[in-house]
């Protein structure tokens, strides 16, 4: 099927590549179907709405930038996403891309969790955590 995207123009996708967010994403509850589209020659991935071309979130796998990042998924999330083990899970965080790019932040408090085998996803809001919605990707470049 052909879809229009925010960053990649019109592209062809396969039904099997669609990730279903049964509850939508907070702030976008009606959006339930997304695809993951790598941005060529970057570590970034676009979580692109299948139905709304202008809706694409910039993601990263957090461990390259935040090597000690760790979360515990509650039983409800494990059940919703039909997760049986770590091999089922892909974990991403949403970026707020800034200008200059050195000011870009990652939302570590609300990761995107995807069951890669069942193609089910959810944005998980972490509670009782020290993670915030804005962690700088490049903390060493903070202005003095």
Curated annotation (Swiss-Prot):
Top-rank taxon, per record: Bacteria
Keyword hit for Coiled coil: no
Impact upon substituting residue 123 to D: Loss of interaction with CsrA
Localization annotation: Cytoplasm
Coiled coil: none
Keywords, ordered alphabetically: Bacterial flagellum biogenesis, Chaperone, Cytoplasm, Translation regulation
Outcome following mutation: residue 125 to D: Loss of interaction with CsrA
One of the GO biological process terms: bacterial-type flagellum assembly
One cellular component (GO) term of this entry: cytoplasm
Family: Belongs to the FliW family.
UniProt-listed PANTHER family: FLAGELLAR ASSEMBLY FACTOR FLIW (PTHR39190:SF1)
Function according to Swiss-Prot or TrEMBL: Acts as an anti-CsrA protein, binds CsrA and prevents it from repressing translation of its target genes, one of which is flagellin. Binds to flagellin and participates in the assembly of the flagellum. Allosterically inhibits CsrA binding to mRNA in a non-competitive fashion by preventing CsrA binding to the 5'-UTR.
Subunit structure: Monomer. One copy interacts with the each alpha-helical wing of the CsrA homodimer, yielding a FliW-CsrA(2)-FliW complex. Comparison with a CsrA-mRNA structure (2JPP) suggests CsrA cannot bind both mRNA and FliW at the same time. Interacts with flagellin.
Protein name in UniProt: Flagellar assembly factor FliW
Taxon lineage: Bacteria, Bacillati, Bacillota, Bacilli, Bacillales
Underlying gene: fliW
């Amino acid at each position: 099927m052909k879809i229009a995207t925010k960053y990649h123009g019109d592209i062809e996708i396969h039904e099997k590549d669609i990730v279903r967010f049964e509850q939508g994403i907070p702030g976008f509850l009606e959006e339930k179907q997304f695809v993951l589209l790598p941005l060529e020659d970057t570590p970034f991935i676009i979580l692109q709405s299948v139905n709304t071309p202008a809706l694409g979130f910039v993601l990263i796998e957090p461990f390259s930038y935040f090597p000690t990042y760790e979360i515990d998924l509650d039983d409800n999330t494990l059940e919703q996403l039909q997760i049986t083990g770590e091999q089922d899970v892909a974990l991403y965080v949403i970026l707020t891309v800034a200008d200059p790019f050195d000011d870009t932040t990652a939302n570590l408090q609300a990761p995107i969790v995807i069951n890669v085998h069942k193609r089910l996803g959810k944005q998980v809001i972490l509670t009782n955590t020290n993670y915030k919605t804005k962690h700088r990707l490049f903390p060493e470049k903070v202005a003095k």
